[in-house]
C-alpha cells in the first residue's frame, strides 16, 4: 500500500501499485487531463509507470516549462518518426533526441529531402496529432526489442541495442499506432499534448558524429505548449536569421571561410580591425588587473602533453605532426605552456600571485559537422590566463577574476549573466580540506559581490571546482563564455613549485581564467547581438565623408585626412553618385557616422552629420566633430540607439 507524498506535503495512500496518472485522477479530472508525466523521488517517469513503494511525487503538467516542454518535444520527435515511416517506408530511423529549443531526428534515406518535403512531412505530423492517439509504452526484454526492430529493418536501432544496451535491460518501446520507437522516456500519454510544432530545416549529420560513418539527414523541429509561444519563437528565429553572423560578415566584408581550410577563418581587413580592437581592449584590462602577457609555442612535443594528461583525454582532438623521429601536437589549449614559463627560475611565495595571460592561437580537430561560421571553428584565439597563487590567496584572486569578467561584459552591454558554481565530483584529486577551502572561497567571492549563482553539485572537474558565466543576448540565447577554474592537478603533474615562508617547496594552486573564451566566437556573438551595428570604437569604418558635387571634393579629402590623423577610421566617398544613393549604401555598411558636405557646409567650415540609424545630428565644426567622435571611441560608448 504505497503512500504518495505530494509537493505540498500532503499524503495519499493507495491499496495497490499506482501510476502518476492514477494519482492525478484521484485529485481531479482537470489535473489528469493536463498530466504529461511524473517525477518520482526526483526521477522522471512516464505517467503510466507504476509506483510500488512509498515515494514523493511531482506531477509534470503543461505548466512545466522545463521538463514538461522537453517531454513534449521528445514526443514530437517520435511523431516525426511516425510521419516519416508512413511517407517514406524505406527510411531507416537512427536517433531523435531533444536539443535546446527543439528536437531532431536523424534518418537514413536515399533521396535528399527538400523544404517542400518538410512541409509535406509536417502536414502528415499534424494530421496524426489531430487524432490525439494514445502513446502505449511497453517494457520488453532486450531480445524482444531487437526482434521488433529486425523485423522492421531498423539497422540503426539494432546497432544501438547491440552496442549500448545491456542484455539484462528491459528497453522501453513506445507504440505510436503502427510505429514503434525505443527510448528511456518519459513521453506524453497521448498526442493531445503535441499540437504546436513545426519543422525547421534539414542538414547532414554523420552517424554517431563520426566522419568515417555514413552521412544521414537530420531533420530539425521545435514544439511548444501553445500557439503563441511557438509563434514568438519563430519570430525570434526570423530575427536571428537576419542577424546571422555569416550573412552580416559577408555583407560587411569581415571574413570568409572556405573548403580548403575547414574551421579556419580568413579575416578580411574590416574583420581584422574588429579583432585587433578587441585585443587592445583586453590588453588594457590585463594591465588594469595586474596581468603579464606571455606567448607560448604553437607546437610542443607529445611527451609534454602526456605528462600534462592531455594526451589521454584530448588526443583525438589534437592536430599532430612529426619531425626527426619526434611527434608533436599543435596546442589545443595554453595551460601546459604557461606552467613551463612559471617553471623557469626559482619562485618564492613573495612572487605570488603570478597572473599570466596570452592571446593563444589554439587548434582543435572539431568534427566537420559541428563547424559553424566563426562560432565553432578549428583554429581560434583564446583570451586565456592562468594565475599561480597560494591556497590563502584563492578567494582574493577569484574575486579579482569575477570583477574583471563583469567589467568586461558591461562594456559590450551584456548585463544578463547567469552564474553556475560546479562542486566536487566523486572522482577527484586533492584533499577534502583543499576542496572545502576552495569551494568556500568561490562561494565567498560570489557572495561578496552580491552575485546570485546556481550550485551544480558534483559537476566540477576532477582537478578543481569552477565558476561558469553565461551571457544572454538580445534574443534570449545563452552563450557560455567565461570560466574561473581551480586546478590542483596540472601544477603538480608538471612540477610547478615555489618556496614557502618556511623555506619548504610547495605546489601552487592554478586558476584557469577565460572571459571572452574564443575571440572568434565572441566576435560572432557581437555581430549577432549588434546586428552588425558595432559601437563606434569597434566599427571597421567609423565615419565616411561624402560630397554632393565635385566642387566639394578637395574639402572632403581635407576632412578625411584630418580625421585619419586623429586616429579615426574615416574615408572619403567622392564617387559621382547621388547623395541619397551614397547614404543608403553606407547605411547598409553600418558606418556609424555619415558626414555630408555641400556648398553651405564648405563655406562655413562645417559638416552635416547623420547616423546610420537615420538620426540628423545637425551641423558641426570639423574640430567639434573630431572631439565628439573621439569621446565616443575613447569611452567605448555603446551608442547603439544613436
Curated annotation (Swiss-Prot):
The keyword DNA repair appears for this protein: no
GO function terms (MF aspect): ATP binding; metal ion binding; threonine-tRNA ligase activity; tRNA binding
Keywords: Aminoacyl-tRNA synthetase, ATP-binding, Cytoplasm, Ligase, Metal-binding, Nucleotide-binding, Protein biosynthesis, RNA-binding, tRNA-binding, Zinc
Cofactor detail note: Binds 1 zinc ion per subunit.
InterPro entries for the chain: aa-tRNA-synt_IIb (IPR002314), aa-tRNA-synth_II (IPR006195), aa-tRNA-synth_II/BPL/LPL (IPR045864), Anticodon-bd (IPR004154), Anticodon-bd_dom_sf (IPR036621), Beta-grasp_dom_sf (IPR012675), TGS (IPR004095), TGS-like (IPR012676)
Cofactor: Zn(2+)
Enzyme Commission number, as recorded: 6.1.1.3
Compartment(s): Cytoplasm
Annotated region described as Catalytic, given as residue ranges: 244-535
Top-level taxon of origin: Bacteria
Catalytic activity: tRNA(Thr) + L-threonine + ATP = L-threonyl-tRNA(Thr) + AMP + diphosphate + H(+)
Entries under NCBIfam families matching the protein: thrS (TIGR00418)
Role description: Catalyzes the attachment of threonine to tRNA(Thr) in a two-step reaction: L-threonine is first activated by ATP to form Thr-AMP and then transferred to the acceptor end of tRNA(Thr). Also edits incorrectly charged L-seryl-tRNA(Thr).
Subunit and partners: Homodimer.
Protein name listed in UniProt: Threonine--tRNA ligase
Amino acid at each position: 500500500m504505497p503512500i504518495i507524498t505530494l509537493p505540498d506535503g500532503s499524503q495519499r495512500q493507495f491499496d495497490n501499485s499506482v501510476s502518476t496518472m492514477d494519482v492525478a485522477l484521484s485529485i481531479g479530472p482537470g489535473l489528469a487531463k493536463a498530466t504529461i508525466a511524473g517525477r518520482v523521488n526526483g526521477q522522471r517517469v512516464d505517467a503510466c509507470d507504476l509506483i510500488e513503494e512509498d515515494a514523493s511525487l511531482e506531477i509534470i503538467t503543461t505548466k512545466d516549462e522545463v521538463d514538461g516542454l522537453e517531454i513534449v518535444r521528445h514526443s514530437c520527435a517520435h511523431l516525426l518518426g511516425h510521419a516519416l515511416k508512413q511517407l517514406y517506408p524505406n527510411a531507416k530511423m537512427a536517433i531523435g533526441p531533444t536539443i535546446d529549443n527543439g528536437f531532431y531526428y536523424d534518418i537514413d534515406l536515399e533521396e535528399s529531402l527538400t523544404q517542400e518535403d518538410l512541409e509535406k512531412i509536417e502536414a502528415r505530423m499534424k494530421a496524426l496529432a489531430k487524432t490525439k492517439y494514445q502513446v502505449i509504452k511497453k517494457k520488453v526484454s532486450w531480445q524482444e526489442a531487437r526482434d521488433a526492430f529486425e523485423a522492421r529493418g531498423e539497422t540503426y536501432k539494432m546497432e544501438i541495442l547491440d552496442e549500448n544496451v545491456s542484455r539484462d535491460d528491459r528497453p522501453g518501446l513506445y507504440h505510436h499506432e503502427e510505429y514503434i520507437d525505443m527510448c528511456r522516456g518519459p513521453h506524453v500519454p497521448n498526442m493531445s499534448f503535441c499540437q504546436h510544432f513545426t519543422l525547421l530545416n534539414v542538414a547532414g549529420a554523420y552517424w554517431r558524429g563520426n566522419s568515417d560513418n555514413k552521412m544521414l539527414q537530420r531533420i530539425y523541429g521545435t514544439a511548444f505548449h501553445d500557439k503563441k509561444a511557438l509563434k514568438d519563437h519563430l519570430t525570434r528565429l526570423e530575427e536571428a536569421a537576419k542577424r546571422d553572423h555569416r550573412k552580416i560578415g559577408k555583407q560587411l566584408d569581415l571574413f570568409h571561410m572556405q573548403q580548403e581550410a575547414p574551421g579556419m577563418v580568413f579575416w578580411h581587413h574590416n574583420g581584422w580591425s574588429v579583432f585587433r580592437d578587441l585585443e587592445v581592449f583586453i590588453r588594457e584590462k590585463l594591465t588594469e588587473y595586474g596581468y603579464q602577457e606571455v606567448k607560448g609555442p604553437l607546437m610542443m612535443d607529445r611527451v609534454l602533453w602526456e605528462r600534462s594528461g592531455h594526451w589521454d583525454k584530448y588526443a583525438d582532438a589534437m592536430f599532430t605532426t612529426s619531425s626527426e623521429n619526434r611527434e608533436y601536437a599543435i596546442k589545443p589549449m595554453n595551460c601546459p605552456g604557461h606552467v613551463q614559463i612559471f617553471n623557469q627560475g626559482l619562485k618564492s611565495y613573495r612572487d605570488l600571485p603570478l597572473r599570466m595571460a596570452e592571446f593563444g592561437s589554439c587548434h582543435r580537430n572539431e568534427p566537420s559537422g559541428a563547424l559553424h561560421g566563426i562560432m565553432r571553428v578549428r583554429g581560434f584565439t583564446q583570451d586565456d590566463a592562468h594565475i599561480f597563487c597560494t591556497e590563502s590567496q584563492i578567494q582574493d584572486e577569484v574575486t579579482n577574476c569575477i570583477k574583471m569578467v563583469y567589467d568586461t561584459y558591461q562594456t559590450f552591454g551584456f548585463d544578463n549573466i547567469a552564474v553556475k558554481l560546479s562542486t566536487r565530483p566523486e572522482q577527484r584529486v586533492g584533499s577534502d580540506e583543499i576542496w572545502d577551502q576552495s569551494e568556500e572561497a568561490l562561494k565567498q567571492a560570489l557572495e561578496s559581490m552580491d552575485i546570485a549563482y546556481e550550485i551544480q553539485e558534483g559537476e566540477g572537474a576532477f582537478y578543481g571546482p569552477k565558476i561558469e558565466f553565461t551571457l544572454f543576448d538580445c534574443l534570449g540565447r545563452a552563450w557560455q563564455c567565461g570560466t574561473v577554474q581551480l586546478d590542483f592537478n596540472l601544477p603538480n603533474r608538471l612540477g610547478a613549485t615555489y618556496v614557502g615562508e618556511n623555506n619548504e617547496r610547495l605546489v601552487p594552486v592554478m586558476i584557469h581564467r577565460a572571459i571572452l573564451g574564443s575571440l572568434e566566437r565572441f566576435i560572432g556573438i557581437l555581430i549577432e547581438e549588434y546586428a552588425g551595428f558595432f559601437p563606434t570604437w569597434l566599427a571597421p569604418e567609423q565615419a565616411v565623408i561624402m560630397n554632393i558635387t565635385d566642387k566639394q571634393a578637395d574639402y572632403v579629402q581635407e576632412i578625411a585626412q584630418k580625421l585619419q590623423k586623429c586616429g579615426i577610421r574615416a574615408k572619403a566617398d567622392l564617387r559621382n553618385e547621388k547623395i541619397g544613393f551614397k547614404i543608403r549604401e553606407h547605411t547598409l555598411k553600418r558606418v556609424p557616422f555619415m558626414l555630408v558636405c555641400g556648398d553651405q557646409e564648405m563655406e562655413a567650415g562645417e559638416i552635416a552629420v547623420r547616423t546610420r540609424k537615420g538620426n540628423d545630428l545637425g551641423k558641426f565644426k570639423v574640430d567639434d566633430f573630431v572631439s565628439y567622435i573621439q569621446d565616443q571611441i575613447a569611452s567605448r560608448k555603446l551608442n547603439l540607439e544613436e
